[in-house]
Amino acid sequence: MMPQHHLPADIERTSMKIITGELAQRGLDIPPENAPVVKRAIHTTADFDYAQTLHFTPGAVAAGIAAMHAGATIITDTNMALAGITKPGLAKLGGQALCFMADPAVAAAAKQAGTTRAVAAMQKAAAEYPGAVLAVGNAPTALLTIAEKIENGLRPALVIGVPVGFVNVVESKERLFAVCESHGVPAIVAMGRKGGSNVAAAICNALIYSAAEMLDPTARGWK
């Protein structure tokens, strides 16, 4: 009979042990500094492909943790990603999370320019929060906008590029990662088609938990 796990902290700890064991069984060796992010993505999706598809520029995780320590502003491209980010942990660090997709000014700017709200939202983010953590889980056009802004001098604290889909997704991720590498901007990118708002939020949470020393669920008040 399988053991029953009812308490959230127990469930999460057991899940992480299973993930660690399966990574070892599959011969997947994750650099220790990247492990919290990779394991959190797998925990969220039950998809071990992220152990191989998540790509990191040098020091990206350390840069993300440092940004959280400094009270980062996280800007997402969807309200779903925004909803998934742990607000208590972020608030403890003095940070905030924002999404501009529902901003009337963004909608008006997108309509006037004949572009998407995702593009207009990232343009607003670049103008108002140039040192933010940018977390994209849905719109490849947002990644292309960020890449262009970086080429023109934008220096976000970290870019998380994990949109999901079939059209322009792979190409936008590859372009963003190449631009971030060449310009020294920290980036975490899920290569290929997979990703999503839940993955973007999970990566943010891994960084927040690490910064707040809340990797163990009991440190987050879970029983």
Feature roles, as predicted:
Residues V167-K223:
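C-terminal functional extensions of proteins
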